[in-house]
A protein has these predicted regions:
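Charged helix-capping and loop-helix junction motifs
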Residues: 71-73, 124-129, 197-200
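Short, well-ordered alpha-helix to beta-strand connector turns
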Residues: 52, 107, 136-137, 179
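N-terminal beta1-alpha1 cap of cysteine-dependent amidohydrolase-like domains
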Residues: 5-6, 11-109, 246
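Catalytic nucleophile loop
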Residues: 111-113, 134-153
């Protein structure tokens, strides 16, 4: 079995995360600095990382300049605290969106920030981001909404008051087309949420899953997609045709490519080895 197929260096490495730096809606102190090392994510990042990487953070809040400036500094420190070397951490928002999108291929690591899915999607469309990603060979990390917007067709799960009850709200919208997998983040925190009097999962998401497949993941879990391989690392659930089932647990890996649970690799180098 293959945990991840790495036949070539020159291809996009896509990390779809829920939260790579903490637990959503939790004030509990972290026992690590930098990115969450759970389920081998830091090891995998280090395996793909290039020294002195040029990094770009694309904001989900394109008009919140002061927030974005602070976030840029925070992620610069997070990368450093993880033990990854970088030469820059730039921000992309409404001040420079098209300029940074045009320069996308000059970066080695691109973060798609978390926030409100439709708002972020509209910004991505405005700067032509989907086209700019064509042929990109670096690392892309989606965070929450950023992971959701990576899909070819995005499931914009209702989140804000009014969205579930509004018949004009679009639940399926065009995405970046980096993956065909629909990620639902923060399952640990939102599984009991209620939006407009409807249970987020049972009354909204399950019915929306008919003819679709969603993957609900908890914070610390991630999907790693490379050429010919897509593997979920950590606790995850599949929602399809209204049926909810757990497919993976913490410390294990599940191949979406092969549809089977597989052992967790002992080291990043074992990603290249078949068993």
């Amino acid at each position: 079995m293959l945990v991840c197929v790495l036949q070539e260096d020159q291809m996009m490495k896509l990390f779809l995360t829920s939260s790579p730096i903490g637990i959503y809606r939790s004030d509990e102190p972290l026992d690590y600095s930098g990115f969450n090392p759970d389920n081998g994510m830091v090891e995998a990042l280090k395996y793909f990382w290039v020294d002195g990487a040029r990094c770009l953070l694309i904001s989900a809040f394109p008009d919140e300049y002061s927030v974005n400036d602070r976030m840029r500094k925070d992620y610069e420190e997070i990368v450093k605290d993880t033990g990854l070397s970088l030469s820059c951490m730039d921000i992309c928002d409404s001040r420079n969106g098209k300029e940074k999108a045009d320069a996308l291929h000059s970066y080695d690591f691109v973060i798609l920030g978390g926030g409100h899915v439709p708002t972020e999607s509209a910004f991505f469309a405005r700067i032509g981001l989907a086209d700019r990603f064509r042929g990109f060979e670096g690392i892309v990390m989606g965070i929450s909404a950023g992971s959701m917007n990576c899909a070819r067709i995005v499931y914009a799960q209702p989140e804000l008051p009014g969205e579930a009850a509004d018949p004009s709200y679009s639940r399926f919208i065009p995405g970046l087309g980096l993956t065909d997998y629909n990620i639902l983040p923060h399952y640990n925190a939102v599984k009991n949420d209620v939006v407009d009097g409807l249970r987020l999962m049972e009354d909204i998401t399950y019915p929306d899953s008919f003819g679709k497949t969603f993957y609900a993941i908890v914070d610390g879990t991630y999907l790693l997609q490379t050429e010919g391989s897509a593997v979920i690392h950590g606790e995850a659930y599949r929602i399809h045709d209204g049926i909810f089932e757990q497919i993976c647990v913490r410390g294990k890996a599940f191949s979406l490519t092969d549809g089977e649970l597989i052992p967790k690799p002992e080291s990043p180098g074992s990603l290249q080895a078949g068993m």
